[in-house]
C-alpha cells in the first residue's frame, strides 16, 4: 500500500506527541505526517513542534501557511477539535477543510464531527470525489453472557494514570508503546482518547461506560469483558493502558471526576504495574505518600513509579464560577530544577518527557514480572 503524505491540522499542545512519535502513525495508517499547521495565534511558523509542549525536540518544523503545506500532502489528518460549536478557530477550520476538498485531498478524522458539520463535509467530499472518513478501530462485539462475573486477565497490564487529566500521560504512553514495540513485544494499547486508534490501539470505552444505564457493578463487569475480548482478539504480550481522567482533586471545585475511570479500571482488572504522572509542582513528600495510599486502597492501583510532567495546573481563574482551570507548560530546565528539589527530599521520581524514562519504566516492569 502506498504511504500517503499527511498534513496534521490543527496542531495544538495536546497532540504534539503524535508528531513526536509519528512513526507509530505511519506504521498503523500508512500515513506519513510530513506537515503540521497550528492556528495563526500560536505564531509557530518555522519552529520545531516541541515549541508547543516544551518537550524533547521532534525534528519536525511547523508551517504557518495551510495552503502551501496542503500542496505538499495527499490528505488531511483532522485532529480532535474541542467545542466545535464555539471554537474561536471554527470558521478558519471549516474554510480550510473546504479548500482541501476542492483540491482533492482526502480528510481523515479522529471522531465523527458534530452536526451539521459531519453531514456537510460528507456531501462536500462526495461532490469533489474525495474520501471523508473517521478512523476507527473496534474490538469484536461483547458476549452479553460474559457480564455474569469478573474474568481474570492473564496478560500483564502496564497502566499510566495522571494525578490530573492532561498531565503528560499521553506522550508518556506513546513513548512506552514505541519502546515496547522496538523490543519486539506485541502490545495492545488502550489510550485515553481516539488518538490511540491512530497508533494501532483502541480508545478506552468511556462513552460506552457513561451511557450504560446500570449500576457500578454492571459497568465494572462490562469493562472487564471488554478487556477480556481485547486479550482474546490480539493475544498480546502486554497491555498498555492509559486511564482517562484524573485521580486526585485539584481543589474543592475541580474534582477530576473523583477518579471515576480509575476506580472502574482498578475494579475491573488487576494492573501489574502503575505509573502516576504528577504536575510540575513541589508537593510535600507526605502528600505524595497519601496519593500513593489513595491509589492503592481507593482505586486498587498501587503506584510503582512517579513521573514528573512539565505541566502545572493553575488555580481557577473565574472567581464566581470556579470552573476554568489553566495550565502552564515549563521548559526542561525548569523541570530539572523541580527534579533536584525532589531528590533533596529523597523522593524517587522520573521525568515524564524523557526518552530515558521510557526505557527505565520498561526495565522496571520486566523486573517486577520476573
Protein language model regions, located:
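Conserved nucleotide-sensing/catalytic segment adjacent to the nucleotide-binding pocket
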Residues: 199-248
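Short, high-confidence coil segments that cap the C-terminus of an alpha-helix
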Residues: 3, 73, 185, 234-239, ...
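Long, basic/Gly/Ser/Thr-rich N-terminal segments
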Residues: 1-134, 307-329, 340-351, 367-370
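Short amphipathic alpha-helices and their capping/turn segments at secondary-structure boundaries
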Residues: 25, 62-70, 222-234, 262-264
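Walker A (P-loop) phosphate-binding motif
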Residues: 143-190, 288
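N-terminal phosphate/diphosphate-binding loop that engages ATP/GTP or pyrophosphate donors
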Residues: 157, 175-217, 292-297
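Conserved catalytic-core segment of NTP-binding enzymes
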Residues: 109-127, 222-225, 243-343
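Flexible, glycine/proline-enriched loop segments at strand-loop-helix junctions
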Residues: 108-112, 160-167, 213-214
Amino acid at each position: 500500500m502506498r504511504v500517503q503524505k499527511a498534513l496534521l491540522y490543527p496542531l495544538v499542545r495536546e497532540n504534539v506527541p503524535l508528531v513526536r512519535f509519528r512513526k507509530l502513525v505511519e506504521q498503523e495508517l500508512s500515513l506519513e505526517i510530513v506537515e503540521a499547521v497550528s492556528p495563526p495565534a500560536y505564531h509557530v511558523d518555522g519552529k520545531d513542534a516541541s515549541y508547543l509542549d516544551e518537550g524533547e525536540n521532534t525534528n519536525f518544523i511547523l508551517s504557518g501557511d495551510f495552503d502551501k503545506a496542503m500542496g505538499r500532502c495527499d490528505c488531511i489528518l483532522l485532529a480532535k477539535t474541542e467545542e466545535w460549536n464555539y471554537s474561536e478557530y471554527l470558521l478558519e477550520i471549516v474554510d480550510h477543510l473546504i479548500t482541501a476538498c476542492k483540491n482533492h485531498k482526502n480528510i481523515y478524522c479522529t471522531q465523527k464531527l458534530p452536526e451539521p458539520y459531519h453531514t456537510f463535509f460528507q456531501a462536500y467530499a462526495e461532490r469533489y470525489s474525495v474520501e471523508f472518513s473517521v478512523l476507527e478501530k473496534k474490538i469484536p462485539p461483547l458476549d452479553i453472557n460474559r457480564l455474569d462475573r469478573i474474568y481474570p486477565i492473564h496478560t500483564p497490564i502496564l497502566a499510566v494514570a495522571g494525578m490530573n487529566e492532561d498531565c503528560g500521560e499521553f506522550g508518556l504512553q506513546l513513548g512506552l508503546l514505541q519502546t515496547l514495540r522496538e523490543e519486539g513485544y506485541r502490545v495492545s494499547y488502550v489510550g485515553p482518547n481516539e488518538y490511540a486508534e491512530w497508533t494501532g490501539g483502541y480508545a478506552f470505552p468511556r462513552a460506552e461506560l457513561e451511557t450504560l444505564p446500570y449500576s457500578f457493578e454492571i459497568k465494572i463487569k462490562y469493562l472487564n469483558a471488554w478487556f477480556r475480548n481485547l486479550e482474546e482478539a490480539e493475544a498480546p504480550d502486554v497491555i498498555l493502558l492509559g486511564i482517562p481522567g484524573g485521580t486526585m482533586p485539584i481543589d474543592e471545585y475541580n474534582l477530576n471526576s473523583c477518579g471515576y475511570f480509575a476506580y472502574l479500571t482498578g475494579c475491573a482488572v488487576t494492573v501489574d504495574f502503575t505509573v502516576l504522572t504528577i504536575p510540575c509542582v513541589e508537593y510535600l513528600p507526605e502528600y505524595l505518600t497519601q496519593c500513593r495510599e489513595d491509589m492503592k486502597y481507593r482505586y486498587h492501583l498501587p503506584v510503582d513509579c512517579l513521573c514528573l510532567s512539565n505541566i502545572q495546573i493553575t488555580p481557577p481563574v473565574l472567581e464566581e464560577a470556579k470552573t476554568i482551570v489553566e495550565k502552564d507548560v515549563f521548559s526542561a530546565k525548569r523541570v530539572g530544577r523541580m527534579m533536584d528539589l525532589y531528590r533533596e527530599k529523597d523522593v524517587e521520581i522520573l521525568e515524564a518527557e524523557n526518552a530515558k524514562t521510557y526505557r527505565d519504566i520498561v526495565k522496571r516492569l520486566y523486573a517486577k514480572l520476573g
